[in-house]
Design a protein with these regions (language model features):
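A solvent-exposed interaction/effector surface
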Residues: 2-4, 13-197
Length: 197
């Protein structure tokens, strides 16, 4: 009887699952790389968002259902909308509130996207934006997020780029992905420093 070692089984499952997750991702151009981070110019895009209260990890769970329902046909046209990556999360006011967003496929704009049926789902158009980005692998803990957020701010401190917005947390993989394979990013909008203007 052949016995497949656990590590080999995980590799096989990942190899099978990975092509199924080959979905559209938010488009960007890499402008510069330094200090372990990237400066990217992101294409204009459309977000479907829900604002929720709760902890860092529970916010995405609370927001997932209304967002998933929206792309599954809970909209004015009963149209199914393709899932994309990444899923974005950012802080909101008051404290302990979060905005969780699905990126809409690039073929949609505010004129063509079907209106949400749920009042808690909002649609916003995002302009082309320059962002500093750090990529890391690992679980979805707040500790890892804060460690890499600090690393990103430190990397920007001595450059010609200044943060000019809140940090976004971007997750690229479904929850079934083993934590050590999960691709995560932290993104911060950046502007030229005064000396560069």
């Amino acid at each position: 009887m052949n016995i497949i070692r656990p590590a080999a089984l995980v590799f096989i499952l990942f190899s099978i699952a990975e092509p199924a997750w080959a979905i559209e991702t938010l488009g960007y151009e890499t402008v510069e790389e330094f200090n372990g981070i990237e400066i990217r110019r992101y294409d204009e895009h459309l977000l479907a968002s829900v604002t929720v209260s709760g902890g860092f990890k529970t916010a995405s769970n609370s927001a997932f259902r209304p967002l998933f329902n929206f792309i599954s046909g809970d909209n004015a046209d009963a149209t199914k909308i393709a899932m994309t990556a990444p899923v974005l999360q950012s802080p909101d006011t008051p404290a302990n509130s979060w905005i969780v967003s699905f990126v809409m496929p690039s073929g949609f704009d505010l004129a063509t996207i079907p209106a949400p049926t749920s009042e808690i789902v909002s649609l916003t158009a995002q302009p082309e934006t320059t962002m500093a980005v750090i990529v890391y692998r690992g679980g979805w803990s707040r500790r890892l997020y804060q460690e890499h957020e600090s690393e990103l701010y430190d990397a920007l401190a001595s450059t010609s780029y200044a943060p000019c917005g809140d940090a976004l947390w971007a997750r690229h993989n479904p929850p079934i992905t083993p934590s050590f394979w999960r691709k995560n990013e932290i993104l911060i909008s950046v502007c030229p420093t005064t000396s560069e203007l």
